[in-house]
Design a protein with these regions (language model features):
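Mature catalytic domains of secreted/periplasmic carbohydrate-active enzymes
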Residues: 1-278
Length: 278
């Protein structure tokens, strides 16, 4: 198992770090917190074996934290590490928060299960299973990762509404994980029928709005060899004519109440221009 650290550059034990106070105008005021950050990050990079990810949190400019110096030290101690973009420098991957915004480099969307990051007893606005799967699929289909936050209560317990939803998502992943793990984006544009991901010579159509017994999509690339329901292995009839592929013999009703997945195998590595479902 790979190991990483979350590290908050800001430390709330320093009362002068609160953003409504003008601490950043006087270097002598915030310097103790910066020195602490450098010392603690060095300790994390030195005392715990191989570290794969350093996930900073914080929102102030890189000059405040002396981030170039800090990250150079990190990479000297952990040459294979990857670092996120929250020290004020782009580094290795982006971390859009509370929105899913694809980037032209590795990225992961940081999303909450309800409306808060920590535990808030009064926050009952939990996302549904369908919403969570939708976020997961949106990230995977656009080449990103989903970082889903769960806030434990004061006793360290995961709130039951989160547990209930995560169990259902976990069951879905056990059945359909092939469409998510290691997936990359495809040129197929999301529409009302399905989103799509690609793994090797297989493409996956992930449908939250099942079209019934027949569906089609535009395709100008490799020959389509086969199609099946991922959950059951049931084969579908494939008809490829010109720039369209028709899928027939599908169940009239969605096999999964949340998101159903079709696995499509093509001849060789998928290569095609960008197309759009119609």
């Amino acid at each position: 198992m790979r190991m990483g650290f979350y590290y908050s550059l800001e430390d709330w034990r320093f009362p002068h770090q609160l953003p409504h106070l003008p601490m950043w105008e006087d270097k002598s005021v915030y310097q103790p917190m910066v020195e602490q950050a450098h010392a603690q990050v060095r300790e994390l990079m030195t005392n715990y074996g191989k570290v794969d990810i350093l996930w900073y949190d914080g929102s102030f400019p890189s000059g405040i934290w002396r981030s170039e110096e800090l990250n150079a030290m990190v990479r000297s101690l952990q040459p294979e590490i990857i670092i996120n973009d929250r020290s004020g420098l782009p580094e290795d991957f982006g971390t859009p928060e509370q929105h899913i915004s694809p980037q032209d480099r590795p990225w992961e969307a940081c999303m909450t299960m309800n409306d808060t990051w920590g535990y808030t007893a009064g926050d009952k606005n939990y996302k549904s299973v369908r919403q969570i799967l939708g976020m997961l699929i949106q990230c995977a289909s656009q080449g990103g990762n989903l970082l889903l936050n769960v806030g434990p209560d004061a006793e360290g317990r995961i709130p039951e509404p989160a547990v209930e939803r995560l169990r259902v998502v976990g069951e879905w992943m056990r059945t359909n994980g092939k469409a998510i793990y290691g997936a990359t984006r495809t040129p197929l544009v999301t529409h009302s029928f399905a989103s799509s991901t690609r793994v090797g010579d297989r493409m996956y159509l992930l449908s939250a709005h099942w079209p019934g017994s027949t569906a089609s999509f535009g395709w100008c690339g490799n020959r389509v060899l086969s199609a099946k329901l991922l959950a059951t292995g049931e084969r579908l009839i494939v008809e490829q004519k010109g720039d369209r592929v028709w899928l027939r013999g599908m169940p009239q009703y969605a096999p999964d109440p949340n998101v159903s997945v079709i696995e499509i195998t093509v001849e060789g590595e998928p290569k095609w221009p960008e197309v759009r479902f119609t």
